[in-house]
Amino acid sequence: TINLYAPLYISNYCPGGCAYCGFAADRHQLRKILTDEEFDAELATLKALGINDLLLLTGERTSECDFDFLSFHVKKASQHIPAVSVESFSMTTDEYTVLRKNGCIGVTLYQETYDRSVYEKMHRWGPKRDFIKRLETPEYALTAGMRFFGMGVLLGLSDPISDAISLFLHLQLLRKKYWQTEFSISFPRIRPEAGGFQPPFKIDDKFLARLIFAFRICMPDITLVLSTRESPSFRNKMAGLGINRMSVASKTTVGGYSSETSPSGGQFDIYDTRN
């Protein structure tokens, strides 16, 4: 069985300096947040596609997109979509608790890389530059009682084998402590974005497939996720073998579902454009 979800970007404002991200503050593209009417239109479009699992995304915390803005949209989305999760800025335990009470069932937060020197090089400025805070944030969400928690590294930033081992050990530690939570692992490869970032490490299909199978063998009960960053052919081959959760019909622009001509800049280029 493959569980399908859709990402919904509600803001692309960001003060951060992530070298690999199209939302970074030095990227020259239009910034936008969804109005109430636009958010309603996005939800209606996704519901018409049969989407029942939604992931709300933002950049780092800003005055335009602060905690109250995110919390409002979580609460509103949960009134229309059965499963609502977030992939956003780091928060406190109290803030994650508010999100849970407003209908959020899960949090996705990537460490990006476990190599601290590479992490600090890639996160040039902004709140996300704090390596230790990023590493500790999963426990804030888990302490708040989130039912689902997604982890991952951005493949290509650093030595992928070292990052995969560190991710595995981190996940093992969290699963022992928060055994009632359902965990997932994602395998995002770096995709082209507005800044033209080139990853230091090239990750081919063969290596990615081996990595997915390794996690499936070592953790047979874990949810493994593959997004539309990957090609249709690769996703087709991996569906049901190692992968049991996939994004579908994805848009990385703000307002991209209800408007095919959304002027806002996307976080990265998607590969699998099927609806």
Language model features with spans:
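An N-cap/entry alpha-helix motif that binds or orients negatively charged groups
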Residues: T1-N3
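Canonical Radical SAM [4Fe-4S] cluster-binding loop centered on the CxxxCxxC motif
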Residues: Y5-E38
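Conserved, mostly hydrophobic/aromatic
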Residues: C18, L56, L109, A141, ...
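Catalytic cores of alpha/beta
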Residues: T92-K101, R147, L157-Q172, S231-L241
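A general structural motif
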Residues: D130-L135, L167-F168, I203-L208
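Conserved mixed alpha/beta catalytic, RNA-binding, or beta-rich assembly cores of soluble enzyme
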Residues: V153, D163, L167, Q172-K176, ...
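Auxiliary Fe-S-binding modules of radical SAM enzymes
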Residues: K176-N275
